[in-house]
Amino acid sequence: MELKNKKVLVIGLAVTGVPLVRVLKQQGAQIIVNDMKSEVDLAETIDAIGHEQIEYILGRHPEELTTLGELDLVVLSPGVPLDIPFIQQIKAQGIEIIGEVELAFRLSRGKIVAITGTNGKTTTTALTGEIFKGAGKNTYVVGNIGVPFIEKALDTTEEDVIVIEVSSFQLESIKEFHPKVGTLLNLTPDHLNRHKTIENYREAKLNLFMNQSLQDYAVLNYDDITSREAGKTLAAQKIYFSRKQILEEGVFVDNQLITIQTKEKRYDVIHIDEIKILGQHNLENALAATAMTFILGVSAEDIAKGLRNFPGVAHRLEFVEEIEGVKYINDSKGTNTDASIKAIEAAQAPIILLAGGQDKGGDFTDFVKAFDGKVKHLLVYGETSDNIYETALHNNFKVVSQVRDLEEAVIRAKGIAQAGDTILLSPACASWDMYPNFEARGQHFKKLVSSLRRS
């Protein structure tokens, strides 16, 4: 992709902003950076990328597109909605609008293994990357997992494997993005404050497969209706995985063994008790990782080694410590009800559950119904506190308390807990009402738990 002397408008700096602008500068582009945050708020970011080749428009969107001159390309941060008036104005002018993932794809080489879904993306991405690395393949693990794709795009070669976690926000702005292997883990309502309807959300997720052909692979969850049904319309070769059923072909569990069945041969990979990551949802993640790595030539033996050694990832059912017989579990990545239901199912009862945060427009009824026989006390805080509290009472779960914030929740939970209990942070909500991201929320929880031991 030729960027030299091209005029590129970057809208929204966010996490991807610094590496994105650096790459554009390196490629010789003329850059305009537009962000709704002020120069004061972005001082550190601006210091990191400098002023050479860059014009900044901060604290507002330009009132008239014409004031920017002749634009060749617009690159959006994933957090910028496509339906705001300024973006609509750009669209009306016929200027190409892409996201960081699309730009990185155009600048990269190598086989792309792309993973999306409502839940399990980060764990599956990390696990898949570890299996490839353990099998001796030069592997980049990028995307929504923490390292922007654009940061590594120019380093990649034809022989590399690029494992990328992609969100629905990122998939809204792809055009040519073309994974060799694309995986849809599952789909349940999420981000409806952005996508408005489940149909729009589904459509964004399925963009993952839109440029695939018969030479590519779509890895699909047979147990998830959306993922399974998607297979009927996709051009790629379909590989299904299932935790609940034995398949004629695909990856599944048979007699407690993760099993690969091809047309020619069956491979018994590993006993599920040898996998360290907890929960039935993580078994599904392991099945998906098995399928993706096997497709690209990793042996059953190397897959087993990777599954056996993988410890899990931070903020996802992460064991923090045990104090006076009470286990503290950090599942800050539980940013929607489905993820938190899976955490409740995986954690050891009795559970004192800490939940709440920014509202994504979801319903908490199924979340509360999952408490039965598992949750002994619910502590809620944040923007969704009233909603969760009222939903709990409406569904006859009476042992619920509203608290000011996470710190008060941890202190109250310690006072309630008895030896043998689990204190589980699994908020079922986004973190943005109180924290910049779920990682910051999880780190704060771990710091609060550490302070309990010191006290």
UniProtKB/Swiss-Prot annotation:
Task: Record the organism.
Answer: Alkaliphilus metalliredigens (strain QYMF)
Q: A Pfam family this protein belongs to?
A: MurD-like_N
**GO molecular function, one example?**
ATP binding
Protein purpose: Cell wall formation. Catalyzes the addition of glutamate to the nucleotide precursor UDP-N-acetylmuramoyl-L-alanine (UMA).
SUPFAM superfamilies to which the protein is assigned, alphabetical: MurCD N-terminal domain, MurD-like peptide ligases, catalytic domain, MurD-like peptide ligases, peptide-binding domain
**Compartment list:** Cytoplasm
* HAMAP family noted in UniProt: MurD (MF_00639)
The Gene Ontology CC terms held by the record are: cytoplasm
Documented EC number(s)? 6.3.2.9
Top-rank lineage group of the source organism: Bacteria
Family, similarity comment = Belongs to the MurCDEF family.
Q: Which InterPro entries match?
A: Mur-like_cat_sf, Mur_ligase_C, Mur_ligase_C_dom_sf, Mur_ligase_cen, MurD
Q: What is its main location?
A: cytoplasm
Q: Which pathway does UniProt place it in?
A: Cell wall biogenesis; peptidoglycan biosynthesis
Please state what the protein is called: UDP-N-acetylmuramoylalanine--D-glutamate ligase
* Keywords, sorted A to Z: ATP-binding, Cell cycle, Cell division, Cell shape, Cell wall biogenesis/degradation, Cytoplasm, Ligase, Nucleotide-binding, Peptidoglycan synthesis
Q: Does the keyword Transcription apply?
A: no
Reaction catalyzed: UDP-N-acetyl-alpha-D-muramoyl-L-alanine + D-glutamate + ATP = UDP-N-acetyl-alpha-D-muramoyl-L-alanyl-D-glutamate + ADP + phosphate + H(+)
Q: Name a biological process GO annotation.
A: cell division
Q: Which residues of the sequence carry a binding annotation for ATP?
A: 117-123
